[in-house]
Amino acid sequence: MGRFIFVSFGLLVVFLSLSGAKGSCCTNDSLPMNGMCYKIFDEPKTWEDAEMFCRKYKPGCHLASFHRLAESLDIAEYISDYHKRQAEVWIGLLDRKKDFSWEWTDRSCTDYLNWDKNQPDHYKDKEFCVELVSLTGYHRWNDQVCESKNSFLCQCKF
């Protein structure tokens, strides 16, 4: 009887410790924040190919969206630490209507924007996707031709 109680207690402890662990998409080279996991991918892709890659990477993933300055600064620091190419990085903001009405691919509210100087400009009426600018330490954004190839930042829900 004593052994049964001991084994049962041991199993209960294991169960409780495992049930407290959240399954997430975060790996050692990812940034967990606000119920999301952010991961940089260095392989250059067009904006559309990058979004499709994120969606296939794990359920609930998209190119990253930003909603506060503090969040943007943490992500910029993460990219600076883990991004090998030191080049621009796609995020999930685009202008589908081509009328400066920017939308996130995850359909979250466009409540925060952080454009670089004189941006967005839709240069030559061809720039409708958004990248983080490396020369700003990944703090500021630029609209870019969607067919350009950049590294990209995915975000996944825990």
From Swiss-Prot:
Keywords: Calcium, Disulfide bond, Glycoprotein, Lectin, Metal-binding, Secreted, Signal
Disulfide bonds listed in the record: C26-C37, C54-C154, C61-C156, C129-C146
Pfam families the UniProt entry points to: Lectin_C
Xref: InterPro entries: C-type_lectin-like (IPR001304), C-type_lectin-like/link_sf (IPR016186), C-type_lectin/snaclec_domain (IPR050111), C-type_lectin_CS (IPR018378), CTDL_fold (IPR016187)
Residue ranges annotated as motif Galactose-binding: 119-121
SMART domains attached to this UniProt entry: CLECT
Residue positions binding Ca(2+): Q119, D121, E127, N142, D143
One Gene Ontology CC term in the entry: extracellular region
Residues of the C-type lectin domain: 24-158
Record-linked CDD domains: CLECT_REG-1_like
Something else known: Met-33 has been shown to be oxidized to methionine sulfoxide but this probably results from sample treatment prior to mass spectrometry.
Subunit structure: Homodimer; disulfide-linked.
Name assigned to this protein: C-type lectin TsL
Organism: Trimeresurus stejnegeri
